[in-house]
C-alpha cells in the first residue's frame, strides 16, 4: 500500500488529464505497488545468488574474445537450457572470461526468479566435507539440489582428494537430468583423472555433466593480462 499512497496524487492527476474511469485509475495505481514488489523480489533473488560481482552480458567484450559465439551465449539468456535441465561448461585458461559469462547467465536466471546459487568448487567441497563430518551430508546435498541453477566456479584449480571426489559425484548425480549446473574449469576433460585422482569417479562425473551439456571452449587471451598491459602503457 505504501507505493499506492506515494503515487496517489500523481495517478489522480493522470486520471483527470486523460479522463480515465475509476477502475482504470485503480489499475494504474495498483501497478505501482506490483512493480515495486517485483523489483524487490528480483533484488532479493540476485542477492541470494551470492554472485562475486554484478556483471551482465552487455558488459562482456565479445570482440576481444573472438573464439566465443556471441549468439550462442546470448541464447543462454533465454534460459531454455534451464527448462531442459541442461548444463553449461565454460572451458579455458585463467582470465578469459569464464566466471563473467557464468555470472551473467546466473544473474539473468535470478532476475527471472529462478533459484540460483554461485559457489567456488573448493568452497563447495569444504561445505560437503564439513557436513559429512557433522552427519548432515544428506541435508547439505538437498540444499544444493534445490537450486534450479547451480554455478560451480574454478573446478580443477585445486586438486580434489578421492573421498572428496565421491562427495562431489553425489551432488552431480543428484542433480543429473533434474537441475541445470554451470561449471567453469581450466582443465581439459581428458585430464580430469588428475583432478579427482580416480579415473572411475572422474568418468562418472564427466558422463553426467556432459550428457546434456553445452561446452564453450574459450581459446582467447586473458582479460586481466590485457588490463595490466593497458595500465603498464599508461
Regions found by a protein language model. Give the residues of each.
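Interdomain "pre-motor" coupling segment immediately N-terminal to P-loop NTPase/helicase cores
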Residues: 2-53
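N-terminal pre-Walker A segment at the start of P-loop NTPase domains
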Residues: 55-79
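Pre-Walker A (Motif I) flank of P-loop NTPase domains
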Residues: 83-89
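Loop/turn-to-beta-strand initiation segments
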Residues: 86, 113-115, 146-149, 177-183
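Conserved lysine of the Walker
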Residues: 98
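Hydrophobic positions on the alpha1 helix immediately C-terminal to the Walker A/P-loop
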Residues: 101, 105
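Post-Walker A helix-loop "phosphate-sensing" segment adjacent to the P-loop in P-loop NTPases
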Residues: 106-119
